[in-house]
């Protein structure tokens, strides 16, 4: 005992969560300002919180619920999926966040040794979900250099040439960490490529409402497609841990397999969180879009802070809550830059190496209100200018 040789090779081979490393870094600092974690600055709707407050003493809140989720929440989600996402043939399972939804799907769809496809820069938690479940052949495809959109031509070649065919392709739309989005024609083409190849497509729609400058989010539906959604960012419910899976109602046995996984991880999402979600949905998507509008100013503030890197080196800001910035040549060790920015300038961001892209930074503009965002951006700009002109001065 006490030897690493006694621990699971799967977990030993899984990346350390970057946010756990960032939290440790922040604990070393005095008054750091975080542009790191993907959070929003608002809380759930006040009316919804007031209703939940009245339920705290109800014994049902402390009980287990159906594995798939409360019936009233699932019905509300089906209505939302039909009306807003145009998903008319889907069923849903409620999960303890979108990350847990993704893990459920990986365990349901993949066997150890299967190959899967992601696109660079990828969402680090999804990559880790594959690692920890024994999916060791993770094929990482390129994003287009000018847009970071998934390269569909590369995907078509890869799926046709790989033997056996990869089991799953996954995309995040809009992108985390890229802050870009997948236009509808491209998303439909990716879906068709996956269908023709006989592989699953998982689309993470966590940031579905976070679209800017008139751009529109869209979903695709099919028997080979599974969509993942989240309440965390939309309704400011990060700590309430609630997400859901939308899958084709025509898939025989799929729900049964999901229940097996669900019953052995959370059993069910927290009942009080599900009740809050029911009440939050009553506020409608307009409640979300009003708050997302406030992020446009934040995005522009952070973009301005990143200008010294050159506009061609800053991508994203089309959707989600992220900008994706390329560091100057000679600074490929992005985690070293992150630590330096934190200790020298008191601002914290995420290294691109966590998403398979050394030499980049992910900068979140969702977690602070405008006044604080300006202060954090000022620290970031000062740090970047010093990095460019003098290097990492101690």
Swiss-Prot record:
Result of knocking out the encoding gene: Suppressor of sav3 mutant plants leading to rescued hypocotyl elongation in response to shade and restored auxin biosynthetic pathway. In continuous white light, elongated hypocotyls and petioles, with increased leaf hyponasty, decreased leaf area, and accelerated leaf senescence as well as early flowering. Increases levels of auxin (IAA), indole-3-pyruvic acid (3-IPA) and the ethylene precursor 1-aminocyclopropane-1-carboxylate (ACC). Indole-dependent auxin (IAA) overproduction phenotypes including leaf epinasty and adventitious rooting.
Reported tissue expression: Expressed in roots, cotyledons and flowers.
Mutagenesis / variant outcome for changing residue 66 to L: In vas1-4; suppressor of sav3 mutant plants leading to rescued hypocotyl elongation in response to shade and restored auxin biosynthetic pathway
Modified residues (N-acetylglycine): 2
Record carries keyword DNA repair: no
GO biological process, one term: L-tryptophan catabolic process
Binding site for substrate: 38, 123, 176, 362, 374
InterPro entries: Aminotransferase_I/II_large, AspAT/PAT-like, NHTrfase_class1_PyrdxlP-BS, PyrdxlP-dep_Trfase, PyrdxlP-dep_Trfase_major
Phenotype for residue 77 to F: In vas1-5; suppressor of sav3 mutant plants leading to rescued hypocotyl elongation in response to shade and restored auxin biosynthetic pathway
Keywords for this protein: Acetylation, Aminotransferase, Auxin biosynthesis, Cytoplasm, Ethylene biosynthesis, Phenylpropanoid metabolism, Pyridoxal phosphate, Transferase, Tryptophan catabolism
Catalytic reaction(s) noted: a 2-oxocarboxylate + L-methionine = 4-methylsulfanyl-2-oxobutanoate + an L-alpha-amino acid; L-tryptophan + 2-oxoglutarate = indole-3-pyruvate + L-glutamate; L-tyrosine + 2-oxoglutarate = 3-(4-hydroxyphenyl)pyruvate + L-glutamate
PROSITE patterns: AA_TRANSFER_CLASS_1 (PS00105)
UniProt: pyridoxal 5'-phosphate binding residues: 64, 98-99, 123, 176, 207, 230-232, 241
Modified residues (N6-(pyridoxal phosphate)lysine): 233
GO molecular function: L-tryptophan:2-oxoglutarate aminotransferase activity; L-tyrosine-2-oxoglutarate transaminase activity; methionine-oxo-acid transaminase activity; pyridoxal phosphate binding; transaminase activity
Similarity annotation: Belongs to the class-I pyridoxal-phosphate-dependent aminotransferase family.
Function: Coordinates and prevents auxin (IAA) and ethylene biosynthesis, thus regulating auxin homeostasis in young seedlings. Shows aminotransferase activity with methionine; can use the ethylene biosynthetic intermediate L-methionine (L-Met) as an amino donor and the auxin biosynthetic intermediate, indole-3-pyruvic acid (3-IPA) as an amino acceptor to produce L-tryptophan (L-Trp) and 2-oxo-4-methylthiobutyric acid (KMBA). Can also use tryptophan (Trp), phenylalanine (Phe), and tyrosine (Tyr) as substrates. Regulates tryptophan (Trp) homeostasis and catabolism in mature plants.
Subunit relationships: Homodimer.
UniProt-recorded name of the protein: Aromatic aminotransferase ISS1
């Amino acid at each position: 005992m006490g030897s690493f040789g006694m621990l699971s090779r799967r977990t030993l081979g899984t990346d350390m969560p970057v946010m756990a490393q960032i939290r440790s870094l922040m604990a070393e600092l005095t008054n750091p300002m975080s542009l790191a974690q993907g959070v929003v600055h608002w809380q759930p709707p006040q009316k919804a919180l007031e209703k939940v407050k009245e339920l705290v003493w109800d014994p049902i809140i402390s009980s287990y619920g159906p594995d798939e989720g409360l019936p009233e929440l699932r019905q509300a989600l089906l209505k939302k999926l039909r009306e807003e996402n145009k998903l008319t043939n889907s069923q849903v399972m409620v999960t303890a966040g979108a990350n847990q939804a993704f893990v459920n799907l990986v365990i349901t769809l993949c066997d150890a040794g299967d190959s899967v496809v992601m696109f660079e820069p990828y969402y680090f938690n999804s990559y880790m979900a594959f690692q920890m479940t024994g999916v060791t052949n993770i094929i990482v495809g390129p994003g287009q250099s000018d847009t970071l959109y998934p390269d569909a031509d590369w995907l078509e070649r890869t799926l046709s040439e790989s033997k056996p065919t990869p089991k799953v392709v996954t995309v995040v739309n809009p992108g985390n960490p890229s802050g870009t989005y997948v236009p509808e024609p491209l998303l439909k083409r990716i879906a068709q490529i996956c269908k023709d190849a006989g592989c699953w497509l998982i689309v993470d729609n966590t940031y579905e409402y976070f679209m800017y400058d008139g751009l529109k989010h869209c979903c695709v539906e099919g028997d080979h497609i599974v969509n993942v959604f989240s309440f965390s960012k939309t309704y400011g419910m990060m700590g309430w841990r609630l997400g859901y899976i939308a899958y084709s109602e025509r898939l025989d046995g799929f729900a049964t397999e999901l229940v097996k996984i669900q019953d052995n991880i959370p059993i069910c999402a927290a009942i009080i969180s599900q009740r809050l979600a029911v009440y939050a949905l009553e506020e409608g998507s307009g409640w979300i879009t009003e708050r997302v509008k406030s992020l446009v100013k934040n995005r522009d503030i952070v973009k301005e802070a990143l200008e010294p890197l050159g506009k061609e080196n800053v991508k994203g800001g089309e959707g989600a809550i992220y900008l994706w910035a390329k560091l100057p040549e000679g600074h490929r060790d992005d985690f070293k830059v992150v630590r330096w920015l934190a200790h020298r300038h008191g601002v914290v961001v995420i290294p691109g190496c966590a998403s398979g892209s050394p030499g980049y930074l992910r900068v979140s503009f969702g977690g602070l209100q405008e006044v604080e965002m300006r202060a954090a951006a000022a620290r970031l700009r000062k740090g970047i200018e010093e990095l460019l002109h003098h290097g990492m001065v101690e």
